[in-house]
Amino acid sequence: MICYPIIMNNQLKFSYKYPSLEPGILIKRYKRFLADIELKSGGIITAHCPNTGPMTGVSTPGSNVMVSYSNNPKRKLAYTWELIEVTDNEPTWVGINTALPNRVIKLALAENLFPELGDYYEVKTEVVYGKDRKSRVDFKLISETKNIYLEVKNTTWADGRVALFPDTVTKRGQKHLRELIGVVEQGERAVCLFLINRGDCYQFAPGDVADHDYGKLLREAMIKGVEILPCRFIVTPQEINYLGIAEFIN
């Protein structure tokens, strides 16, 4: 997968290209990591499902899906499930591969895509931090002023036009918020970036129904200075394009 930054009208248009994807129909997802899919080209395959969550609203049998293929002989499953088409509002592709957002954001950070982050001159990944030094933040942006600790969350669940996170109880996510609060208390900047992996949502809100404690903690973190960036992306079988910041609904 490749990132192509394109200059248009003096603005940076960020586009992340998928490899060639093959269409199919989802038969079922099971054991979290497996999905049976009927390929449009014929035949039924078992694909790797790179998403450990409940995938609320984005794992409906009979839905159109897209898969990638790998000829790596060391892989147990040659196909990986990448996208699903939902019809909550209008037909919309959703990226379900949870390994992808960090790769997308890493490339976006290299292109200084988000002016909200200000100036930084180095991007570090998987940096140890936190009260007990046992946590790792997705990105640390080195700045001449305050360094930025940035955590990325893949967001696929939606209620109408509102993207929601999380879609299940996440103790790990709660811990990340506490660690980010600690970063602010130490005088640095902390950012939680929600990558909205579908183009039909214009707003973002905490998924209180799924994890009330996370929603409460997220609001507390914002009050204490943790910055929230709910980033809208439109997804197609060819590419992912950045659309801007979604409105946060408290």
UniProtKB/Swiss-Prot annotation:
InterPro entries: SfsA (IPR005224), SfsA_C (IPR040452), SfsA_N (IPR041465). CDD domains: SfsA-like_bacterial. Signal peptide: none annotated. One of its GO terms (molecular function) is DNA binding. It comes from the Bacteria. Gene3D superfamilies: 2.40.50.580, 3.40.1350.60. Belongs to the SfsA family. This is Sugar fermentation stimulation protein homolog. It comes from Trichodesmium erythraeum (strain IMS101). The gene is sfsA.
